[in-house]
């Protein structure tokens, strides 16, 4: 009889704008992780982000060689997914159609587009599979949830899919259940804040944490009064880019307090800064209110609420949110995020036969 759970060795790749994080995992256990920093001058040699893939791939292979890691022992390479067409969650084989969309920048140019391309190149050379897991374009929203109130605008699913899904599985396991059988609310709280309604393995509703929807966050404005925003847009004082920056980049804590660092805000509060306390409380209030709305989407059948991301390290912040929502359901806290491990887990589920890999299709 074939043993499904023999040890697998997985290379994980997470490209950022000026760095590439890599990890080598034995099943879920990390045996090597490193952030490869890329010199700005080196990157500026390339006209497009996508042209960096050979340079970054070589940097990864050189680093593994220096560490004495035998790449011929890898069972799979798994990368952070890029800006693709909307797809349901899961672990996807990096196929020709995906490479085509990543290289052409179908849904935009972003460093994460390099992940699948590099993974495929390394994996093909070793004759092993390459995957991506739960990219930001995961879209499982119900048709009802996509209605905005204006026929010209449809609500979009853009959220921290990789961490939300990984943490949801972890929470389900801690409760002795399967993610695919649970109804839960996952709240990722980092530079952006997204609250996902997880209904038996699918995120059927979630706020767009990038382009101004939901609670304000350390550097994003979230939902703001629409009429007043229109007035700002047509005041003649701001360009389109400046308005977008107010929504994403200089909004939220940064706009009110001059910093997007939650640790610094907590220090300001401890030092007696009443404005900092007030704004921090307002952010907790908005997060809690959005969680309340998410519970209505599940008709109150909420088996767990999970708080995750960098802000979940803030004990006073978490405590403030709990005070509003602990009547709804049990609140579990998993601070931070581990994208490399989440990628390894996604590949492992397929390698061990717990899940089927999915195929990306251009229709």
From Swiss-Prot:
InterPro entries: Aliphatic_acid_kin_short-chain, Aliphatic_acid_kinase_CS, ATPase_NBD, Butyrate_kin. CDD domains: ASKHA_NBD_BK. Transmembrane segments: none annotated. GO terms for cellular component: cytoplasm. Its EC number is 2.7.2.7. It is found in: Cytoplasm. It catalyses: butanoate + ATP = butanoyl phosphate + ADP. Pfam families: Acetate_kinase (PF00871). Keywords: ATP-binding, Cytoplasm, Kinase, Nucleotide-binding, Transferase. One of its GO terms (biological process) is acetate metabolic process. GO terms for molecular function: acetate kinase activity; ATP binding; butyrate kinase activity. It is an enzyme of class 2 (transferase). Its main location: cytoplasm. Belongs to the acetokinase family. PANTHER family: ACETATE KINASE (PTHR21060), BUTYRATE KINASE 2-RELATED (PTHR21060:SF3). This is Probable butyrate kinase. It comes from Bacillus subtilis (strain 168). The lineage of its organism: Bacteria, Bacillati, Bacillota, Bacilli, Bacillales.
């Amino acid at each position: 009889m074939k043993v499904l759970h023999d040890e697998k060795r997985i290379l994980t790749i997470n490209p950022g704008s000026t760095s590439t994080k890599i990890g080598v995992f034995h099943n879920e256990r990390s045996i090597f992780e490193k952030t490869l920093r890329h010199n700005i001058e080196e990157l500026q040699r390339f006209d497009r982000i996508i042209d960096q893939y050979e340079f970054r791939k070589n940097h990864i292979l050189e680093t593994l060689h220096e560490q004495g890691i035998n790449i011929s022992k890898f069972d799979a390479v798994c990368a952070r997914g890029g800006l693709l067409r909307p797809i349901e969650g899961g672990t996807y084989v990096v196929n020709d159609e995906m490479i085509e969309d990543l290289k052409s920048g179908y849904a935009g140019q972003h460093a994460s587009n390099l992940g699948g391309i590099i993974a495929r190149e390394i994996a093909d050379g070793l004759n092993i599979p390459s995957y991506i897991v739960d990219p930001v374009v995961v879209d499982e929203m119900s048709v009802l949830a996509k209605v905005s109130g204006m026929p010209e605008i449809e609500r979009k699913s853009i959220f921290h899919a990789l961490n939300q899904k990984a943490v949801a599985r972890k929470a389900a396991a801690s409760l002795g259940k399967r993610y695919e059988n649970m109804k839960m609310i996952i709240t990722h709280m980092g530079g952006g804040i997204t609250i996902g309604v997880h209904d038996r393995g699918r995120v059927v509703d979630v706020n767009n944490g990038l382009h101004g929807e939901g609670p304000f966050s350390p550097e994003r404005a979230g939902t703001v009064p629409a009429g007043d925003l229109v007035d700002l847009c047509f005041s003649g004082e701001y360009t389109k880019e400046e308005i977008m920056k107010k929504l994403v980049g200089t909004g939220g804590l940064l706009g009110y307090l001059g910093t997007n660092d939650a640790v610094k805000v907590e220090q300001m509060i401890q030092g007696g800064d009443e404005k900092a306390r007030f704004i921090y409380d307002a952010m907790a209030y908005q997060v809690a209110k959005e969680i309340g709305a998410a519970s209505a989407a599940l008709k109150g059948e909420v088996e767990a609420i999970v708080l995750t991301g960098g802000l979940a390290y803030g004990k006073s912040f978490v405590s403030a949110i709990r005070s509003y929502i602990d009547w709804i359901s049990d609140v579990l806290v998993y601070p931070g995020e581990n994208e490399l491990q989440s990628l390894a887990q996604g590949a492992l589920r397929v390698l061990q036969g717990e899940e089927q890999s999915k195929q990306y299709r251009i229709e």
